[in-house]
From Swiss-Prot:
Assembly with partners or alone: NDH is composed of at least 16 different subunits, 5 of which are encoded in the nucleus.
EC code(s) of this entry: 7.1.1.-
Keywords, comma-separated and alphabetical: Chloroplast, Membrane, NAD, NADP, Plastid, Plastoquinone, Quinone, Thylakoid, Translocase, Transport
HAMAP family to which the protein is assigned, alphabetical: NDH1_NuoC (MF_01357)
Record lineage: Eukaryota, Viridiplantae, Streptophyta, Embryophyta, Tracheophyta
GO molecular-function terms, A-Z: NADH dehydrogenase (ubiquinone) activity; quinone binding
Subcellular locations according to the entry: Plastid, Chloroplast thylakoid membrane
Function: NDH shuttles electrons from NAD(P)H:plastoquinone, via FMN and iron-sulfur (Fe-S) centers, to quinones in the photosynthetic chain and possibly in a chloroplast respiratory chain. The immediate electron acceptor for the enzyme in this species is believed to be plastoquinone. Couples the redox reaction to proton translocation, and thus conserves the redox energy in a proton gradient.
InterPro entries named among the record's database cross-references: NADH_DH_suC (IPR010218), NADH_quin_OxRdtase_su_C/D-like (IPR037232), NADH_UbQ_OxRdtase_30kDa_su (IPR001268), NADH_UbQ_OxRdtase_CS (IPR020396)
Keyword NAD: yes
Signal peptide: none
Taxonomic source organism: Lupinus luteus
Gene: ndhJ
Descriptive protein name: NAD(P)H-quinone oxidoreductase subunit J, chloroplastic
Any one GO BP annotation for this protein: photosynthesis, light reaction
Keyword Plastid found: yes
Length: 158
């Protein structure tokens, strides 16, 4: 079943894949990594002015990673804000997605956390570096194929 936003994107020739609706009735769309930045700008102009959250997860060991964006359209005089969930999947040796920091500034720490935990690179992010783990940490702790070290060294504990 195609939602309102999906129909609008089709009408304007923007390539995506409708993933239906979640349990709350929020429309979910899949966007290709190479199209994500331009579609993000279009969604912002269309009225999705609030990035509620960005997260990422590992779909399968050694394979597909997903970056998930929950966008909200907030306007004066509207009782129920319109929401959409966008999923961008990456796979292979080049795990990169265009950063949407320049569209929604609130993506800053959220994209950095996804990078730190799963190793997804966000192109054109101004400060893409580890945020939770030390810079010297090797690997991506939330990947399903991550092998935890035998020991942990407490560093810079204050």
């Amino acid at each position: 079943m195609q939602g309102r936003l999906s129909a609008w994107l089709v009408k304007h020739g923007l390539i995506h894949r409708s993933l239906g609706f979640d349990y709350q009735g929020i429309e979910t769309l899949q966007i290709k990594p190479e199209a994500w930045h331009s579609i993000a700008v279009i969604l912002y102009v269309y009225g999705y002015n609030y990035l509620r959250s960005q997260c990422a997860y590992d779909v399968a060991p050694g394979g597909l990673l997903a970056s998930v964006y929950h966008l909200t359209r907030i306007e004066c005089g509207i009782d129920q804000p319109e929401e959409v969930c966008i999923k961008v999947f990456v796979q292979g040796k080049i795990l990169g997605i265009p950063s949407i920091f320049w569209v929604w500034k609130s993506a800053d720490f959220q994209e950095r956390e996804s990078y730190d935990m799963l190793g997804i690179s966000y192109y054109n992010h101004p400060r893409l570096k580890r945020i939770l783990m030390p810079e010297s940490w090797i690997g991506w702790p939330l990947r399903k194929d991550y092998i935890a070290p035998n020991f942990y060294e407490i560093q810079d504990a204050h």
